[in-house]
Amino acid sequence: MQSPPPDPLGDCLRNWEDLQQDFQGIQETHRLYRVKLEELTKLQDNCTNSITRQKKRLQELALVLKKCRPSLPSESLEAAQELESQIKERQGLFFDMEAYLPKKNGLYLSLVLGNVNVTLLSKQAKFAYKDEYEKFKLYLTIILIVISFTCRFLLNSRVTDAAFNFLLVWYYCTLTIRESILINNGSRIKGWWVFHHYVSTFLSGVMLTWPDGLMYQKFRNQFLSFSMYQSFVQFLQYYYQSGCLYRLRALGERHTMDLTVEGFQSWMWRGLTFLLPFLFFGHFWQLFNALTLFNLARDPECKEWQVLMCGLPFLLLFLGNFFTTLRVVHQKFHSQQHGSKKD
């Protein structure tokens, strides 16, 4: 005896009933989520306001302490120093707290993204975004090495040069946006290592608009060779800095949101000093580029405004990179000598 044919409509109705039950559960979960979200928003506002009040009172306290310190007796100086160190420590704790609270974007992010909130609320999301930023720098650095090598030795075309410079503009613009978001999420990036990306963006934009001609051809090979070397050094820095940061984070000596940078910082002193000759050579190459462009600008045949406007950013990059690196090295030598005297 044959079984009755399946009822397609009945199966659909049973599936619909199952979906209805699941949907009711989803609705309840979503309602609970909305309630918790409102509670979270209120907690964020309360915490932000409390931190703002505390920071204001700390600033007032630090100012009063600074004014009265010269008149303090010698036996009270140690207590004043201890209070100052506690105030600085408290300010650092507030910085870590604010990394998990919504905040207003700075001028640059407001111009680019508007008032959208870019604060990531979990450690996992922050670390994932930081890790993606590091991979982005690594992959683009390798691509820039390949393209600059191709333009330098295989292709002599203004079109490919323009594509290379356009990639540089896009790369540095993207870095500035991502770094601003990371700063909002607790990354401690030193001022110059952020600002020099804005200078590099401007420089790449001017190079992009430089028309082909005698002055361009005189500087072209030097610029492409410098770009190759700079990308190679950046690759070395990423490779060794990422390993050093991993070890220091495991020891609890570095923050989880610390980033690799295109320069030298105090935490790199142990194990990464071998990078200093590469860095200083690159800094002086930037100075050489600036002097070359200034000499070209004095040539009677030079008609392009881009020559001088490329020389100035190269000079600024040299001054910023060289003296920032030199200051870090000087501070480390000074601290080591001070420590040895204490011993």
UniProtKB/Swiss-Prot annotation:
Compartments (UniProt record): Cell membrane; Nucleus inner membrane; Endoplasmic reticulum
Family matches, as InterPro entries: TMEM120A/B
GO BP term (any one): fat cell differentiation
Membrane topology: Multi-pass membrane protein
UniProt keyword annotations, A-Z: Cell membrane, Endoplasmic reticulum, Membrane, Nucleus, Transmembrane, Transmembrane helix
Chain coiled-coil ranges: none
Extracellular side: 153-158, 210-218, 295-304
Gene Ontology molecular-function annotations: coenzyme A binding; monoatomic ion channel activity
Positions with a binding annotation for CoA: K130, S187, R188, Q237, Y240, Q241, H283, K332
Cytoplasmic topology ranges: 1-132, 178-190, 241-270, 331-343
Any one of the GO CC terms: membrane
Bilayer-spanning residue ranges: 133-152, 159-177, 191-209, 219-240, 271-294, 305-330
Annotated PANTHER family: ION CHANNEL TACAN, TRANSMEMBRANE PROTEIN INDUCED BY TUMOR NECROSIS FACTOR ALPHA
Subunit structure: Homodimer. Forms heterooligomer with TMEM120B. Interacts with PKD2; TMEM120A inhibits PKD2 channel activity through the physical association of PKD2 with TMEM120A.
Record note on domains: The transmembrane domain (TMD) has structural homology to the very long chain fatty acid elongase 7, ELOVL7, despite low sequence homology between them.
Family (UniProt): Belongs to the TMEM120 family.
Role summary: Multifunctional protein involved in mechanosensation, and plays an essential role in lipid metabolism and adipocyte differentiation. May function as a potential ion channel involved in sensing mechanical stimuli. Mediates the mechanosensitivity of the PKD2-TMEM120A channel complex through direct physical interaction. TMEM120A seems to affect mechanosensation by inhibiting PIEZO2 channels, possibly by altering cellular lipid content.
Protein name: Transmembrane protein 120A
Organism of derivation: Rattus norvegicus (Rat)
Gene: Tmem120a
